[in-house]
Regions:
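Active-site cores that bind ATP or allylic diphosphates and position pyrophosphate for catalysis
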Residues: 4-393
Length: 393
């Protein structure tokens, strides 16, 4: 059983999943799948974002959830950042939206994505959400200049429906997204696992950051780092998941660092700052991570109108630190590393104390140089990554 698997994992030195059991909602038997499909009253085509949520529910990335939240669970999570009943921490509500007026409690809904049957939802609850309240409580603002607020206001439809999920088939993606069970099976016994979250290609400063995190005071010897990029829909100006995947594979092959593990997460960012930091920690705990690297502006967002930050630079870090013990995890502060002419990469404090010459290249300037065919300094980006980007964007 899944409970036995979780206990076995804990016995071999892996952190327990959130709630103590790694959920697996996938139906394996083909006859059972056929019966589940035949029992459905209606079908619903999923958005890219919803498909990510169905996948993470089905494979246990959102453990201990076993489906989309019903109205009571949704309200409780929005207001308290906890799951109703167990009172376990949970950063953001997991909901399914629909415009269908006819869907009713008791319906069996076939969930489809890109022509494929991915799951069945048994509707336990249908309601019109208070979206301004959700925005204010979860994102800290009701301004539609915030991408997450714009998403719930304009992309999500009139109703939310909640209920248990049965997984049929995982969405087909052009890159692999190993399940929590698969990632855990590849982790070392009894060692710390430090998670690094990103949604962009990995450049030199990122690599320095997550490799140095393995030397942090609260990280044990022989620890490994799980580089775990989010691969769902991102912001409009972000590089596509497939192109980023190609850069990660190329870099992993180049560095061949035995302390670095790579896996890909079918999660769509909300840019919800502090509450999303908690969500990321819970997900990474389910994937077997004991530590989480968190830096300035984690899951942060700027106004699309005036460029002002919606969150303070350390809001997410403070929220993560305040709740880490309850999650049974530890945070690792993200070092502010800079490149210097004299000593290569050092922390900004060391550079300042020694009066070293710091070299800088903004992300905007990097993209301009990339598109213009200019040489990219090797201190800023890996040649192999630049080559992949040039070939694909």
């Amino acid at each position: 059983t899944r409970a036995y698997a979780a206990a076995a994992a804990a016995g071999r030195g892996l952190i327990e999943p959130h709630g103590g059991e790694l959920v697996n909602l996938m139906i394996v038997d083909e006859k059972e799948k056929a019966r589940a499909i035949a029992s459905c009253d209606r079908a619903l085509e999923l958005s890219d974002r919803n498909a990510c949520d169905v996948e993470l529910l089905s494979v246990g990335g959102f453990s201990p959830l076993r489906g989309f939240m019903n109205e009571d669970a949704y309200e409780h999570c929005v207001e308290t950042m906890r799951l109703k009943g167990s009172e376990l921490l949970f950063g953001l509500p997991i909901v399914l939206d629909t415009a269908c007026e006819d869907t009713k409690v008791g319906d069996r809904v076939l969930l489809k994505y890109q022509g494929k049957d991915v799951g069945v939802l048994t509707v336990e609850s249908k309601w019109k959400p208070n979206k301004p309240k959700e925005a204010k409580m979860c994102y800290g603002t009701s301004s539609i200049e915030h991408p997450g607020v714009a998403m719930i206001s304009m992309e999500r439809r009139k109703y939310y429906i909640g209920g248990k999920i049965e997984g049929l088939n995982l969405p087909q993606r052009p890159f692999p997204c190993p399940t929590p069970e698969q990632v855990r099976a590849d982790l070392p016994t009894g060692k710390d696992v430090v998670a690094f979250q990103c949604r962009n290609p990995v450049h030199r400063a990122h690599y320095e950051l997550f490799t140095r995190a393995l030397d942090a005071e609260n990280v044990g010897k022989e620890a490994v780092c799980l580089v775990h990029p989010t691969m769902g829909p991102t912001q409009d100006d972000d590089i596509s998941g497939l192109v980023r995947y190609k850069t990660y594979v190329t870099l992993a092959d180049e560095v061949k660092n035995p302390q670095i593990r790579w896996a890909y997460l079918p999660y769509s960012m909300h840019m919800a700052g502090p509450r999303e930091a908690i969500q990321h920690m819970i997900i990474r705990k389910n994937y077997g991570c004991t530590h989480f690297i968190i830096g300035r502006d984690m899951a942060g967002s700027k106004s699309s109108l005036d460029g002002e930050d919606f969150y303070g630079a350390y809001d997410a870090q403070d929220m993560a630190k305040a709740n880490a013990a309850e999650l049974g995890m530890q945070t690792v502060p993200s070092l502010n590393v800079v490149y210097t002419e004299e000593e290569g990469y050092v922390t900004a404090d060391v550079a300042k104390d020694k009066g070293l010459n710091v070299k800088k290249l903004s992300g905007t300037k990097f993209r301009q140089m990339l598109r213009g065919g200019e040489d990219i300094p090797e201190w800023f980006a890996f040649k192999s990554v630049v080559k992949v980007l040039r070939e694909n964007i």
